[in-house]
Amino acid sequence: MLDLLCPVCGGRLAREKTVWRCESRHSFDVARSGYVNLLPPSASGKRHGDDKRMVAARTAFLSRGYYDHLIGAVAGSCAQLTGPDACVLDAGCGEGTYTRAIYDALAAKGGCPQLLGADISAEAVRRAARQGAGGVFFAVAAASLT
């Protein structure tokens, strides 16, 4: 699996049942729906990325099939360019539509892919985790907030 880094100290995070923790003991709880929020504590309470209404609108639009050809092309390219046991990061995964399609395309090759979907929007990641697939893990994360 992809290594996750602590947003506080930069140390490697390890999963311990329902929490991700670094060697410096900074910890990040895994939500009931299965995702982890890795935004730094200084970002707590602030809204980042899409809100619930925006995520719902995007999900409704994508469910109408307008982008199915593009989603299929992206997933197919990933399957073609990687092995069936690939470890893939979907940075800016939104509500997980592309992430799940990539997972399905890789799994169809008979492998056991591992995908990490990351987005700065907690609402989008919540929805992605609720609709997730095996082998897909979602995190609220950002490379930098400055």
Where are these regions (language model features)?
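Conserved SAM-binding loop of SAM-dependent methyltransferases across substrates and taxa
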Residues: 95-110
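Conserved class I S-adenosyl-L-methionine
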Residues: 85-94
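Conserved SAM-binding strand-loop segment of SAM-dependent methyltransferases
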Residues: 133-144
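N-terminal auxiliary segments of SAM/dcSAM-dependent transferases
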Residues: 1-48
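Conserved SAM-binding loop
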Residues: 128-129
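Class I SAM-dependent methyltransferase Rossmann-like catalytic core
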Residues: 51-73
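Conserved SAM-binding motif I beta-strand of class I
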Residues: 114-119
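Conserved SAM/SAH-binding beta-strand->alpha-helix loop
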Residues: 121-123
